[in-house]
Amino acid sequence: LASSAASDVYKRQMDKIVEVLKRFQAVEHRIEYVTEKRGVKFYNDSKGTNPDAAIQGIRAMNRPTLLIGGGYDKQSEYDEWIESFDGKVKKLVLIGQTKEKIAECAKKHGFEDVILCDTFEEAIDTCYANAVSGDAVLLSPACASWGMFANYEERGRIFKEYVRNLAE
């Protein structure tokens, strides 16, 4: 009887935990799931404004990933960021002041699947055009947003809005 009562209490507690987890929302702009289109999942990690933060975004991916990076040049080094790709990142799509600098760093580390874009929208479109079902598109730029956006929040909001409006 005691074990039956304990089991019933445990089940009710687990049901509550499951409900809370179902309603849990990630922190906005931090490895935030946005939507899925044609089997491609989109993630907003606009808060990844430096290489160390952006490494965490890459580590969180469990699918082949097309990564949008680049932005304002804060004189960061990108070696560790590129090394963290470790087979997870299949394509690096770059924007902003740092795009050439990051492309050179990627080449130095043997990562050659790099595309340079002139606009943020072009980068998103390029990722979507090159993604296949089962892939992820991750905005985790390793750079500040200045010069292209007011702040990382604006960059993240624009990303989410643009992605949600992509054609199926």
Over which residues does each language-model region extend?
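ATP-dependent carboxylate-amine ligase
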Residues: 12, 19, 23-29, 33-41, ...
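Single conserved hydrophobic/aromatic residue that forms the stacking wall/gate
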Residues: 1-6, 10
